[in-house]
UniProtKB/Swiss-Prot annotation:
PANTHER family: INTEGRAL MEMBRANE PROTEIN OF SOXR-REDUCING COMPLEX, ION-TRANSLOCATING OXIDOREDUCTASE COMPLEX SUBUNIT A. This is Ion-translocating oxidoreductase complex subunit A. The lineage of its organism: Bacteria, Pseudomonadati, Pseudomonadota, Gammaproteobacteria, Enterobacterales. It comes from Buchnera aphidicola subsp. Baizongia pistaciae (strain Bp). It is a multi-pass membrane protein. Pfam families: Rnf-Nqr (PF02508). Keywords: Cell inner membrane, Cell membrane, Electron transport, Membrane, Translocase, Transmembrane, Transmembrane helix, Transport. It is found in: Cell inner membrane. The keyword Cell inner membrane applies. Its EC number is 7.-.-.-. Part of a membrane-bound complex that couples electron transfer with translocation of ions across the membrane. GO terms for biological process: electron transport chain. The chain crosses the membrane at residues 1-21, 48-68, 73-93, 103-123, 135-155, 172-192.
């Protein structure tokens, strides 16, 4: 059982990464990754929101939607859970760290529309995961998001100090870098055999 959880954890971080493999969450990936500080803040915020949403969505799914045969309302319910969770988290971040709140800017409310935040509870529902698997799936997927965001932002900081040809400055070199990072993560594909 422990090995199952370990494989789930490692595969979601490295092999089935939401950004580089499933191409979910590309808006904050490209938008907030200019500096490492904002990437760390966004990664932590997204991790907290995803874990909280995974817990609440599993509880609502298991205790309300399934028993009352309302599973067809899961997408709408999860969207509501995400919106409320992000608003709560935004209030907490504003109170705790006004600097982080200003750094994240528009991207903090945009966690609401981050498709990876919605994909995780939907996949938990589809996979019929138990509570521990759901929380671990959410946590490990968000750690994979966080890892790629921090790696990409550190690379972008180095690129911003480099002499890049004029036509490649900005998003073109960022997309090329992201594709090379995705190719590098493809090397983890054979790491786990099920």
């Amino acid at each position: 059982m422990v090995m199952h959880f370990f494989l789930l954890f490692v595969s979601n971080i490295l092999i089935n990464n939401f950004i580089l493999v499933r191409f979910l969450g590309l808006c904050p990936f490209m938008g907030i990754s200019r500096t490492i500080d904002s990437a760390i803040g966004m990664g932590l915020a997204t991790t907290c929101v995803i874990v909280f949403v995974s817990i609440i969505s599993w509880l609502i799914n298991f205790y309300i939607l399934i028993p009352f045969h309302l599973i067809h309302l899961c997408t709408m319910t999860y969207m509501l859970i995400i919106a409320v969770s992000v608003q709560i988290f935004e209030i907490i971040v504003k109170k705790v760290s006004s600097t982080l709140y200003r750094l994240l800017g528009i991207y903090l409310p945009l966690i609401t529309t981050n498709c990876s935040v919605l994909a995780i509870p939907l996949m938990n529902t589809k996979l019929n995961s138990n509570f521990i698997e759901s929380v671990l799936y959410g946590f490990s997927s968000s750690l994979g998001f966080f890892l790629v965001l921090v790696i990409f932002s550190s690379i972008r900081e180095r690129i911003s100090e480099s002499d890049v040809p004029m036509y490649f400055r900005g998003y073109p070199i960022a997309l090329i870098t992201a594709s090379l990072l995705a190719i590098a993560f493809m090397g983890f594909d054979g790491l786990i055999k099920f």
